[in-house]
Amino acid sequence: VCPCPTGNVVLQTESLPFAEIPQQSKLFVEYQLDPLALKRFYPSAVASHTQIAARIPEVLAHHHADRDLLCDALEEMNRKSGASDKTLENIKLLRESNTVAVVTGQQAGLFTGPLYTIYKALSAVRLTECLRGRGFNAVPVFWIATEDHDFEEVSKTAILERAGELAEVKNEPKRCYENLPVGYVKLDDSIKQTIDELFGELPATEFTGELRTLIEETWQSQTYYGDAFARLVSKLFGAYGLIILCPLDDRLKRLAAPVYVEAIKKSEEIVNALRARSDELQAEGYHAQVLIGEDYFPLFWQAKDHTRNALKRSENGTFKTKDNAREFTLDELAEIAENEPSRFSPSVVLRSVVQDYLLPTVCYFGGAAEIAYFAQSGEVYRILNRPQTTILHRQSFTVVEPKHARTLEKYGLELKDLFTGLENLHPQIVEKYLNNETARLFTEAEQKINVELNRLDQNLSTIEPTLADNLATRRRKILYHIGALRHKFHRAEISRDEVTRRRLETMFAALLPHKHLQERTLNVTNFLDRYGLYFIDWIYEAIDLDDKGHRIIYL
């Protein structure tokens, strides 16, 4: 039994299997249903989070990074981010040789990015508390993906504005150029305008002032993007003792140098194994998350100006940066990695190995895509003689506010009904709740037409069989036109009933924005503005690590 602490807040929740949610990968759905059946791709898979503790001896035996150097770096970066006493206590605990880490991570999104960032952090905290409740030393760590150079992806976030419609908030510093890691992007005065836009869209509540102060204190001009993200995360999760980690730190790069060197020397073996694993996955009917070409290399080159360039194997056996500005032999790359490890950053399939070399990682909480590419990166662990970390899916939520719960109830809907799309729900809503009299007349008309056409069909069949065939064609056309008219009736009724139309549109914007799960689109400021920082605690209390489905929380 997992002795997870329970709180005083009890929220109504429901669980929806991922198999019932559109656009989920086959590999992810099957992993959620039965991870042990996929042991060939996930050798450290467990049936339940309660089995994670059994991995602790193996994790500790394979962790050789200098804990004091690691924790010195972590202490400095967390103090810089305004760490709580509990976080600093956890860093002190991590110095002890029998302490393991429960890790998660995400890109440094604007104002924390999508909601699932919050859910990842709280998932790690919850499992940490489970392990501690069983007498194990464990700490939660959040790996900020500051090495990632896709700034476009993290520079914007979505909220619900005062009328309940979706609005995008974006920040674009003037000095942000292609291939620059997010951690080296510096905020300028444009962040003030972005904050003004955010609070111009959010409704004014009793919590708005507190939230604005929090955002303004953490997202400041002349602050690096990753640092701003770290400050806000530290504030939101300080009470939970979450440790933040920025991999751009030179001290961490030096600690990771042995992994870089070994990955470089074994790069050809890694690429061959990854390509073979991709073929194996595809042969089993799964999708390979990361495409691995023959020229693939597991590390990026970081230039003096900090820009990040992919390295590619050339036909003559050397390695060139994607822009062809630099060319190296394998021995040269290995020597540079040993002496100047800050010139490198790991690719997606190597990143987790670096993470688990630096940290005594007992478990990683990831999303569906991360679970998918772990099936590939497992080969990198094997080649580098590392035990593959157990990966669990982060907790997944849709938060339903009272007004949207009332709309669902009023029209007899569940969250999964929304996946068909708003327009496809119009017939059900119109005919059952708005105008069942006209709907009845349409049904009766179709029935009467079919009765009379059936009589005519019987008569024509005795005269000339081909006439009956002709009638069947015309019947389909008649019923098609009646159906088209009925569809226009549905649209007209919805348009005429403005209250219903607005209720449905705002519900879809809140629960399925841009036809995606809420957690993939909306930013946490929406809920912090309405409910204050209590919202973080409510989500934490709603976490159930035994539930591997998508959970619906009714506030």
Locations of regions flagged by a protein language model:
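A glycine-rich helix N-cap at a beta->alpha junction
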Residues: A158-L187
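Low-complexity, highly charged intrinsically disordered N-terminal segments
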Residues: P22-T87, F297, H481-R486, L504
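N-terminal catalytic cores of NTP/NDP-binding nucleotidyl/phosphoryl-transfer enzymes
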Residues: S97-R132, G366
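Long, compositionally biased intrinsically disordered regions
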Residues: C4, L11, L232-F328, N424, ...
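A structural-propensity feature for long, helix-poor, extended segments
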Residues: V154-I159, A163-A167, V399-E431
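Short acidic, glycine/serine/threonine-rich loops at helix termini
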Residues: P114-Y116, D150-T157, L255-Y260, Q376
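A translation/RNA-centric and nucleic-acid-associated enzymatic feature enriched
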Residues: A288-V362, A368-E379, R394, E401, ...
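Glycine-rich phosphate/pyrophosphate-binding loops
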Residues: P114-L115, T128-D150, T389
